[in-house]
Amino acid sequence: MDRDLLVPEPMSTTHGTVAFFDESWTVEPKELQIFFQAEDVYWTSHRTIEQWRRLLACSRMLTARLVPEGSKGGRLVGATRVWSDHAYEAKLYDVVTAQDMMGLGIATVLVQWALRHPWVGDVQRFVLETRDAAPFYPRFGFARGEEMDSVHMRVRVDELKRRGLR
C-alpha cells in the first residue's frame, strides 16, 4: 500500500486513545472555531464560521480526537491544516494541540502526516509561519527564513485598500 495513503495509527495515552482523521469535508466549522478559541490560539481568534468554511474549501484539515472505545467521534484534541499548489509549494497552518494533551506527540503525528499527505502533491518545499513554536519544527527539517533561498514578504489587505489596489 502507498505510504501516503496511510492514516496514522491510533495512539494510546494516559487520557485514552487518540485517533487521527482527515476531516476536510466532515468537520463542522463551528467545532473548529470553538476548539481554537478554547485553546486561546491568538492567530485564529478573529475567524468567523464563514471564514472557517472557506479555509476548509481550499486546504486539508487533519485532526486528532480522543475517542471512546469503538467510536469514530470524540473530543477534538489536535488539528493542523495544510494548503498546496500541488506542484511547487505547500504550507502548514494552524498546528494546535489541546493544552491538556500537550507533550504526548499529537502535533508531531499531525505534522508528519501533513508532510506526506497525498493531497499535497509533488511539491518542492513546505513553508510555515510561527511566533512561538519555532523550536518544534527543526525536527522535521524546517529552518528559519534567513536560511532559505528567498525573502518572505507579505502585505495586509487594509494596506492594499489604502493604496487603491483592492
Feature names for model-found ranges:
Residues 50-96:
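A conserved beta-strand-loop-helix scaffold within acyl/acetyltransferase catalytic domains
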